[in-house]
Swiss-Prot record:
Protein name, per record: Large ribosomal subunit protein uL10
UniProt entry tagged with the keyword RNA-binding: yes
Keyword annotations: Ribonucleoprotein, Ribosomal protein, RNA-binding, rRNA-binding
Subunit structure: Part of the 50S ribosomal subunit. Forms part of the ribosomal stalk which helps the ribosome interact with GTP-bound translation factors. Forms a heptameric L10(L12)2(L12)2(L12)2 complex, where L10 forms an elongated spine to which the L12 dimers bind in a sequential fashion.
Start and end residues of each stretch annotated as Disordered: 298-338
Family statement drawn from the similarity comment of this UniProt entry: Belongs to the universal ribosomal protein uL10 family.
Biological source species: Saccharolobus islandicus (strain M.16.27)
Top-rank taxon, per record: Archaea
Amino acid sequence: MKRLALALKQKKVASWKLEEVKELTELIKNSNTILIGSLEGFPADKLHEIRKKLRGKAIIKVTKNTLFKIAAKNAGINTEKLEQYLTGPNVFIFTKDNPFLTNMFFENYKLRRYAMPGDKAEEEVIIPAGDTGMPAGPILSVFGKLKVQTKVQDGKVHVVKDTVVAKPGDVIPTEALPILQKLGIMPVYVKLKIKVAYHEGLVIPAENLKLNLEGYRSNIAEAYRNAFTLAVEIAYPVPDVLKFTISKVFKNAIALASEIGYLTPESAQAVISKAVAKAYALATAISGKVDLGVQLPAAQQTQTQQSTAEEKKEEKKEEEKKGPSEEEIGSGLASLFG
């Protein structure tokens, strides 16, 4: 037994494993980010498409989990938190890029494969019209089961019109599988499932790698609108805000001049219009009690009444409208503008 144990100890490690560990160690040392993806259920032949797409941005390696673990330790990484992810067939992605952006690539990059029994359609599966290249024979009955109209021309089966054989969510009919393969139709999407990312000492599980860009855009846009509204309200002195602030101040000044009857070239029209409206309103109110010696046009009376009503509405709005308190403005400035 002692001799057997000694022989096992002296057994040499395969040279390819040593080379693999050496290469992996260098890759780990030269990468800011390492992603571990599961190859379970993922067609191995599709990896070359991903390699092609990420050429110059990332290096993709399929290796044994034990070899990666040894290399990681050699590179000074504590693999304790990665242990749970080093199971089953894995692929390792080495990159200098941000882990979130790299994961986004894998989230959005879908590959196609041929359908297998039990697969569900993610989109309409269509057998297109035209020459199938298939010789007439038993295959015609299969087309019949799928309710695909066909005709035989020059000994070949031709599909008369585009036909949907599966809708989104439907299981793709087993009868359709050989036809889809012969026609080169790959209706099933597959994507590499990322398990975890290791970035500069941080272990980031897959669920924490997903970015909700639309949500972020919406939040930023809302924050900008709120900040801009506040900035206009307090006349914060920056170019983008001042042009709106000046416009608002000008309108308020004209409204005030109109109310107190202050005449300037800019306010004259508003002041006179308001004075005329008030005069007609007063004349209308007393015309039934006092003979004014003039006939008020009916249309003008209606217009005056409408103007008076609108003025009351505007006054009510102004009364209801309350600006932010000094404390609110102070806290808003502190949070928005440092």
